[in-house]
Amino acid sequence: MPGQTVSDLVDAAAPALEIRALGKRFGAKVAVDAISLVIPTGSCYGLVGPNGAGKTTTLSMATGLLRPDAGQALISGIDVWQHPTEAKQLVGVLADGVKLFDRLTGEQLIRYHGLLAGLDADTVASRCSDLLAMLDLTGAGTTLVVDYSAGMTKKIALACALVHAPRLLVLDEPFESVDPVSAA
């Protein structure tokens, strides 16, 4: 809505994520069939199921990466498809299989994501430094992402999802390619 900020649209009493009858077909294949789910703020949920069950498709629709054929997704009460810009400001997404700008260094990539999220340069610099340290990537911050291992790439993608301090964090296959010590 013109003149409104994200804060104006957020419903503090709303769940962190609400999915209402989301559905998606790929041709004749039903990938997701009217799934509904309410995830309260402050909670941690996992979607578990066999390969091809629709977990990634569901998360992609819920976070605005894939348009559903039916249903609705709300982040803190904001409809992902009616107010996509505002909703996406509230969520950090570690998507499975999404390519990164791997010709940037890890530090440059995190800074890029922070600036895209509308953070000022000083805040981005501080958060970038903190995230590199937290994820044990300080020494790799000046290395091109293309030269990272699969596990390091996953960690730098997580840093990009966290840089703007989102209200909701959605992780798809977060431990794939990550060493057991980092996963713990």
Where are these regions (language model features)?
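Conserved ABC ATPase signature
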Residues: 144-151
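Conserved ABC ATPase "signature" region
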Residues: 111, 115, 122-140
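Catalytic Walker B motif of ABC-type/P-loop ATPase nucleotide-binding domains
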Residues: 169-173
